[in-house]
A protein has these predicted regions:
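C-terminal charged capping/lid subdomain of soluble metabolic enzymes
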Residues: 100-169
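Active-site segments that bind and position negatively charged phosphate/pyrophosphate groups
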Residues: 2-124
Length: 169
């Protein structure tokens, strides 16, 4: 692991977790919006991921949003928790990182083991998106119906994931 980068990313995520609901509920709140812009600038800085492999598949998969007139952030809000669940089911070695995310960013109660903490963290993220940000959490809520999933699979196949119907519908 790369503790400096990991800690910086965790702090950025925690800051976004704290400030984004304020920026959404109070769009005129300069401090919250400025903090979000500053956090976004840091998140895009390669310093945060220097030295370790990132999960760029999520951003590659998200490119479908331009086809369906969704913002980048909305598409990521919909697919990120499902993508995390997919990764956790595919590769249990991510459980520790996802558990840390749940505990330190989402503020979950310790469930006693990494796998349970990872699942609780993903659930907390999903609830945050739905309940605090008031965003849709499925593609079907965005009127992306089953007949469009074959087209969406081209994005999935480009990043070596499986049938999108199973994950996001």
């Amino acid at each position: 692991k790369y503790p400096l980068q990991f800690n910086v990313v965790e702090t950025l995520l925690r800051t976004v977790r704290q400030q984004l609901p304020i920026a959404v509920e109070e769009p005129e709140n300069y401090s919250a919006r400025a903090t979000m812009l500053w956090a976004a600038s840091w998140a895009l800085n390669s310093f945060c991921t220097s030295g370790y492999k990132t999960q760029a598949q999520l951003h590659a998969l998200e490119q479908f949003s331009s086809t369906y007139d969704m913002t980048h952030g909305l598409a990521l809000a919909i697919i990120t928790p499902k993508w995390m669940t997919y990764l956790l089911n595919k590769d249990e070695t991510v459980a520790g990182d996802f558990a840390r995310f749940g505990l330190n960013v989402m503020g979950i109660q310790d469930q006693g083991n990494d796998m349970a903490n990872a699942k609780a963290g993903i659930e907390a993220l999903q609830n945050f998106i739905k309940d605090e940000l008031h965003l849709p959490t499925t593609l079907s809520e965005m009127n992306i119906t089953d007949e469009k999933f074959d087209e969406l699979n081209k994005f999935v196949n480009a990043v070596d994931i499986y049938d999108i119907r199973q994950q996001y519908g």
